[in-house]
């Protein structure tokens, strides 16, 4: 089998499609020379045979076979007939997956305007035509005529709007025996708009606008600049203004608007099929009316209905009454499928699930370092499975991948020590949606934890705008060495202390951290349990607190031989001196008691503090290692 070469491209550009381009999307020449692509019938499938109707919205001749390597009539089956076009049904024998990308088209009996360009904000049709949006709508929806050529009539101007009565009056004057009026042309509907757009010489209009901009100011200048910008964009993209009206409508592949049979024999179908059916029905009816030379008022009404059907297909509800289906539910148009949070871009393209990633609720991990995160064992073994398998084979515990997977599935105790080894020094990235700035995704060193929640250091919460009331975070594993290096050097949490927006520290204790520090170090005169007791050292005092002999805020005395004691206020003033009779002296300060020898050396020093302050000081000292 020949390897397919990947098409290389530099960028994707979105531009207005010409009618020829739309026709090219859907039109194909079969190997036998038959040209197919135009959808002419509104039928979907035959409800007796359950096969797609020919030339309908699910036609196998246009879009490809419903079953792999099988034509519509069943004459050709199996892959050996690849590429053959059936003489009976005209279906090319190929894979059914072509129905996911082969398009069709509908040739319209009359042009229609594209609702995005008419009713969008701003309305590009009204900007290009230099007319009010209300006036353009009047023309498009057959409520007013527009003068396409004033001829020799002095009372008419180019692009002037006329009501039905005014046009009837002018017609009477034109067809009068003594009339001298010549060359007057008026139009209505999208055909008139298409002609007005086609008559625009974009380069000439752009030059004229540049001259006018130089001579004008204020609101008029802003309006001219807006029009020039639109025209310049048309020129730059080699697009023509009349392409904003449609002569041909693309029909998207049938597998993207499926029809499936339910248990009760009923069918569930995509809303697009109903919208396409409306367009085809009205288009066929209009073509038939034009053939039989029906009265102009009937043809005009059918053209308006066709315009409304195409509007509903492209963007249902943008203009006029919303088309509804069963249970008065608005039908989902092409725009509804593309736009919004559940649309194709945000949901399916940007919101794809990626390999080597997981998601779980976050809980606080107070014992973690700032650059660490607690990763549940269950999640870690899944994320790091390839690395664990490689390590198991390298250590000779298993011989192949299958045996390694079996060992992991069984939950063998050996795998946990291997997992510990694998994750050491391998950072993971944590991301919390919405990622509004670069600190919304940071790297951490994983620590294996029990349970099913990711543990996060409380100090990194402001960067993620996270809290622990049920927030979820995603974990991603950088696979290549380059990615791991970048994660460690650039994205590690301890390297992201400053806010990129303000340059101020974003890592700052808040809420319960500040409250905890305050509570530990606060003074409470009412705490009398064990107050005034003496302890030989810090450990003794903490042991007494653990056994409930002293309160957290009780004032106690601790022997502390280090001279360097920091107090809230300078404590250098001796309040009282007591001679102990053995040549030593006891000096009493506000928060200290010092026993000095004959030569003034410190024998013993007691300082007044609380168990809470001891805990705080000890924790800080251990963290800073001084």
UniProtKB/Swiss-Prot annotation:
InterPro entries to which the protein is assigned, alphabetical: DNA-dir_RpoC1_gamma (IPR012755), DNA-dir_RpoC_beta_prime (IPR045867), RNA_pol_asu (IPR000722), RNA_pol_N (IPR006592), RNA_pol_Rpb1_1 (IPR007080), RNA_pol_Rpb1_3 (IPR007066), RNA_pol_Rpb1_3_sf (IPR042102), RNA_pol_Rpb1_clamp_domain (IPR044893)
Cofactor requirement: Mg(2+); Zn(2+)
Keywords assigned by UniProt, alphabetized: DNA-directed RNA polymerase, Magnesium, Metal-binding, Nucleotidyltransferase, Transcription, Transferase, Zinc
PANTHER family: DNA-DIRECTED RNA POLYMERASE, DNA-DIRECTED RNA POLYMERASE SUBUNIT BETA
Catalysed reactions, as listed in the record: RNA(n) + a ribonucleoside 5'-triphosphate = RNA(n+1) + diphosphate
Protein name: DNA-directed RNA polymerase subunit gamma
Enzyme class: transferase
GO cellular component terms given for this protein: DNA-directed RNA polymerase complex
One GO molecular-function entry: DNA-directed RNA polymerase activity
Keyword Iron among UniProt keywords: no
EC number(s) reported in the record: 2.7.7.6
Domain of life (superkingdom): Bacteria
GO BP, sorted A to Z: DNA-templated transcription
Protein family according to the UniProt entry: Belongs to the RNA polymerase beta' chain family. RpoC1 subfamily.
Known role: DNA-dependent RNA polymerase catalyzes the transcription of DNA into RNA using the four ribonucleoside triphosphates as substrates.
Cofactor: how and how many bound: Binds 1 Mg(2+) ion per subunit.
Subunit (UniProt): In cyanobacteria the RNAP catalytic core is composed of 2 alpha, 1 beta, 1 beta', 1 gamma and 1 omega subunit. When a sigma factor is associated with the core the holoenzyme is formed, which can initiate transcription.
Positions contributing to Zn(2+) binding: 71, 73, 86, 89
Residues involved in Mg(2+) binding: 467, 469, 471
